[in-house]
A protein has these predicted regions:
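Alpha-helical transmembrane segments and membrane-interface helix-loop junctions
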Residues: 1-101
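Alpha-helical transmembrane segments of multi-pass membrane transport proteins
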Residues: 36-40, 44, 77-569
Length: 569
């Protein structure tokens, strides 16, 4: 990549071809392993509603096959072939496993080849892992990086790649996991409907009359939409320009202040139910607490309690961001939006269906009337009815033809966008769980815990180091993979230092929420740069004051457990 006769375009081309080769190699290996998972581990005599269980696992195979076929392009022939060859080489242990356990056949040549792959991966383990991490920084998709590291560790440790795909399949059978794509679909229905404009109008009418009210309203809108889409990036990209335009039109704020406020507010919604981050944390921690019932407060480790534990920190974050806007507005002597009770009442009436959403979630989830997955399903049904009626009403008022085909296209587009986000999240979760299981099964997690206990003897020092580690982790990794990899390591340490499970969860999720803003590579910084069409360094500078304010809130959440435990049952 550094040859002097290469221009910048050539460097990008070579890099993309290397990424293609790695992607195809890993995807083909996981495709082979997925076939083994279906053939060797799933019993055909366990049908679901009369349908063979293997049918439900087919998307796993088709997904990896789709990744490979997506790279089939004329300009990719050489890297594609290279990836296929490497993938076949890495699949040899899986082929050998299939021959032995399915066909009861020991093929000496295949067995020797599989053993050679194990030995080669073991010898090159460190170099391959460092190489994958380096390629991740240069553009290799995160789930491929995690899958590649898991592949190197498992195969280098004498196991077959089937362990990875089987772990992912087992995780996807978790009863809480379907809530993730369902809430994502619900969030996208909400964000793509007219609810956005109605909520913005409501919050402006309700809060715009006091100093900084419109900025405070913008914070609430960001929080609301991040909560229900489950992806803070969607909030920035879909609503950043709209909200920035509204605030800049007031003349009360500098452009950098507006961009910093909206960027900093875009991830706060991850602290409110039905936060997908909380669901993933619960999934990651359940295995640990089930196997260690003697851990401090293990009986309190429920998804409902974690939801309750992050509500107060979320409120404090929202007040901190909104309060800073109020202070800036007072300082600049900004004009206020005149309160009109008629307009406010009309806006309230129009947004009543959306305002009932939190109540629906609380009513069904926290009272036990429905499981999290059932609540998500009911929410989708509710939104389809409500937003469908409002869409029809809006079109009628604007005298727009309400063709059935247009509504169908809207639904297909919404579900397609939601599925791409949810699918990406689920595959990251599956690969991260496989890596996490390796750390546990091979004793690396236990070694890390013991090593930490030997050098950290103070709860104060542990919490300080934990916050630093999690801020860095949140900067480098997405919240889902970070949760599944890191949580099994910190829960035993939290128990050792006497930290309540719900308090630990609140600290963890709060840190990773702030991690999205942490320079130099916090994800939201780059998304904001794109959304606001500003250099990323400009976004850095605009975010710093709000980032520091959020660190103050983090200190409160860390050192005042009551903030997280006040509602815990």
């Amino acid at each position: 990549l550094t040859l002097t006769n290469f221009g910048n375009q050539d460097k990008v081309t070579v890099l993309s071809k290397i990424i293609t080769t790695i992607t195809v190699a890993i995807a083909l290996t996981l495709f082979s392993a997925s076939c083994n998972t279906i053939i060797l581990t799933l019993q055909p005599f366990e049908p679901i509603y009369g349908i063979p269980i293997q049918v439900f696992a087919l998307p796993m195979i088709l997904g990896y096959l789709g990744i490979i076929t997506a790279e089939v392009k004329k300009e990719n022939i050489i890297p594609l072939l290279a990836g296929l060859i490497i993938g076949l080489f890495l699949s040899l242990p899986a082929f050998n496993e299939l021959a032995i356990f399915r066909f009861n056949s020991d093929i000496p040549v295949l067995m020797k080849a599989a053993n050679f792959v194990h030995a080669a991966m073991d010898f090159l383990r460190i170099f391959l892992i460092l190489g994958l991490i380096g390629m991740a920084l240069l553009g290799l998709p995160l789930f491929m990086t995690i899958a590649g590291i898991a592949l190197v560790l498992y195969v280098g440790g004498g196991q077959t790649p089937t362990f990875i795909t089987y772990t992912g399949y087992n995780l996807l059978r978790d009863s809480s996991l379907p809530a993730i794509p369902l809430f994502t679909v619900a969030g996208f229905i909400l964000s793509k409907s007219g609810a956005t404009k109605r909520l913005v109008k409501l919050f402006r009418e309700a809060f715009g009359w006091f100093p900084g009210g419109e900025a405070f309203a913008a914070v609430l809108v960001c929080v609301f939409f991040t909560t229900f889409t489950g992806a803070n990036g969607v909030t920035i990209l879909a609503m950043g320009s709209l909200l920035a335009g509204i605030l800049l039109d007031t003349g009360a704020y500098q452009e950098k202040t507006v961009h910093g406020l909206l960027t900093a507010s875009s991830s706060i919604g991850l602290l409110f139910p039905p936060s997908i981050a909380v669901i993933v944390y619960f999934i990651a921690g359940t295995f640990i607490y089930q196997n260690n019932p003697d851990f401090v407060g293990s009986e309190s480790f429920t998804v409902t309690n974690i939801f309750l534990g992050t509500i107060v920190p979320g409120i404090i974050f929202s007040l901190a961001m909104g309060g800073s806007a109020v202070w800036i507005s007072i300082k600049n002597k900004a004009p206020r939006h005149q309160f009109n009770i008629k307009e406010a009442g009309s806006a309230l009436l129009n947004t009543l269906p959306e305002l009932l959403i939190p109540l629906i979630i609380v009513l069904f989830t926290f009272t036990g009337l429905a499981s999290l997955t059932e609540t998500a399903s009911l929410l989708i049904l509710y939104l389809l009815i409500v937003e469908g009626l409002f869409t029809y009403k809006d079109k009628k008022q604007e005298q727009i033809s309400n063709a059935i085909g247009d509504d169908f296209k809207f639904m297909v587009s919404t579900v397609s966008d939601a599925v791409s986000i949810a699918g990406g999240t689920l595959i990251i979760i599956a690969m991260a769980r496989a890596l996490s299981n390796y750390l546990i099964d091979f004793g690396l997690a236990e070694y890390f815990v013991t090593w930490t206990q030997n050098i950290v003897h103070s709860k104060v020092l542990f919490l300080l180091l934990l916050n630093i580690l999690l801020l860095i982790t949140g900067c480098l990794m997405d919240i889902f993979s970070a949760t599944l990899v890191i949580v099994p390591l910190i829960i035993p340490l939290g128990n050792y230092f006497g930290i309540h499970p719900v308090h630990l969860a609140a600290i963890f999720i709060t840190n990773l929420t702030i991690g999205f803003l942490t320079p130099p590579i916090g994800m939201n910084l780059f998304l904001a740069s794109y959304a606001f069409n500003k250099p990323v360094l400009t976004i850095y500078k605009s975010v710093v004051p709000f980032f520091l304010l959020q660190l103050v809130v983090l200190v409160l959440v860390t050192w005042i457990p009551a903030l997280s435990l006040v509602f815990v049952r």
